[in-house]
Amino acid sequence: MSEKSPPRTILQMLGAVGEAQVQQAVRLAAQSLAQLGAAWVLEVSHMGYLFGLFDALGVPENARPGLLEKLREKNAHELRRAAQAAGLDAAGAAALTGLLELSGSCEETLAKAESACRNDRMRAAAAELRALAKTLEASGGAVRLDLSLAGEMEYYNGLVFQGYLQGLPRPLLKGGRYDLLMQKFTPGAGAIGFAVYLDELDRLSAPTPPVQRNSTDRVMLNVALPKGRLGDRMYDLLARIGYGCTEDYNATRKLVVENPAAGIRYFLVKPSDVAIYVEHGAADVGIVGKDILTEASADVYELLDTGLGRCRMCVAAPADYKDDPSRPVRVATKFVNIAKSYYASIGRDIDIIKLNGSIELAPILGLSDVIVDIVETGTTLRENGLRVVTEFMPISARFIANKASYQFKHNEMDAMLEALRKTLQEETK
C-alpha cells in the first residue's frame, strides 16, 4: 500500500512563467503565512546560484546530489569532506562551505552573494533574488535569504522557498520553480507554485506544556542532553561558557533543569531519543552521536561536529573470514539502516539479523558472517577473536538543531555555537 500524501493546499502557475508570475507566487506565499500566524519566516534561495557555483568549480554531475544533501543539513564538516572526495581542492571546498554563511537578512546576504558570483548563471540568480527582495520589503514578517536551502536538483531549477510559523516544528509551506518537471509534459512551459501542509496547522491549537512556558521575556533555548557521560561532558562545557544552571546538574534527579537568566533549559533524555525530541520540536537543539543520527535519518540541521566521543562504524568478522560472493552476506547489527546503506553503496546483497546487544557473539555462534557495530579501541573484538574488515563511518557527538527553531532562534543558537567552538578548539590545542 502506498503512503498517503499529507493533506495540503496547492497553488500553481503553469505555462508562460516570467518574472511577474514568480514574484506574484512568492508574494502569495508570504501573504498566506501572514494570514496563518503572527510570527512567520519565509526562507528563500535559488537553485541557479548553486548550480552556477557547481559549474564554476567543475563539480562532477554525479557528486552534486550528495553535496546538495549536505548543504540542506547545514553540515559544514561533512560538506567539506564530500567536496574533497568529489575532486575539489581546498579553495573549492571552502567556496562550497561558504554558502552556509550566505544566510540572513535580504540586503546583507545579497551583498555577500553578489560579491561571490563567479559566472553569469550566479549573477542572473542574484539579480532575480534582488528584484524579489524589493517586492517583499513591505510583507510584514521576516523574509530571509539562505543559499544553503536546496531543492531536489531534478525537480527545481530556480527560486525555492519554505515558510515557517512560530510554534510548528517543521516547514508549513514549501515551493519553488520547477520548469524541468513541467517540460517533461509540455516542452517550453514553465511552472512555479507552493503547497501549504494543512496537518501542521492542527499543532497550533495544542497548548504549550507548562515546563516550556517562559517565566521571563528572554528567549529560552531548549537543549536535549543525552543521559550519561556524553551529556555530563557537554553540560560541563556549556556551563563554562555561561549556560549553567543554579541547581547542581550532577546531583539532581529532575529531567528538566533551567536557568531563565541564561536563557537555557535542559531536557535529560535517553541518547537514542535526542534526535527525535529535536526533529519534532520538543527541543530546539541537542547533542547526539552520529551513529544514532544516521540510523534515525532525522530531519534536522547538523551544525557542529564536537569531536567528542570519537569512534567508528565498522564491519568486523572472525579472523579467518573470507567473503563468498555467490551468496548474500549475513550481517548482525543493531544499526539496520546504516548496514543496509553501506552494503547498498558497494552493491552487495545481505541478509540482516537485528540484534540489540552482544553483537560480537553472532559470528562466534554462526548466526552471522559479519557484524556492523561501533568500534572504539577494538579490545572487545580482539578478545572475541574478531577483526575489523572495513571502517566506513567516523562517529562523534554532533550538535543538531530543529529546522523551524533555527528560523526563530538562530541568533541564540549561533551565539552558543560560536562560544562552544572556541572552547572545543582551546581544549584540542
Regions found by a protein language model. Give the residues of each.
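A structural preference for short, hydrophobic beta-strand core positions in alpha/beta folds
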Residues: 42, 145-147, 268, 352
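Flexible, glycine/proline-enriched loop segments at strand-loop-helix junctions
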Residues: 11-20, 39-41, 66-70, 116-123, ...
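Short, conserved phosphate-binding/catalytic loop or strand-edge motifs used
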Residues: 5-9, 45-52
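Domain-level signature for soluble enzymes in the chorismate/prephenate branch of the shikimate pathway
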Residues: 216-429
